[in-house]
Amino acid sequence: MSDETTTTDRAIISVLGADRSGIVAAVAGLLAEQDVNILDISQTILQGMFTMTTLVDLGGADIATIHDGLAALSEKLGVQITIQREDVFKFMYRL
């Protein structure tokens, strides 16, 4: 990650749903198609429920286009997928 990356260039993608194969590959593939770089990824499976949180560098990618792609992927995989800019995410979840 370059020092020039700001929080407005980054976003948090969250995935929640029943565990199944291919979720990580599908999300990563969509991001790669949009030239979005994964900076950090965390995933957990609790009692059959899959959760994943991913920090990405949007670079010059259009967040609305990524949102639309993730929405279609969410429906296809049967999981919930959300994307928020990092600064909005931090504001909403501050303690």
Give the location of each predicted region:
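A conserved regulatory-domain signal marking ACT and ACT-like small-molecule sensing domains
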Residues: M1-L95
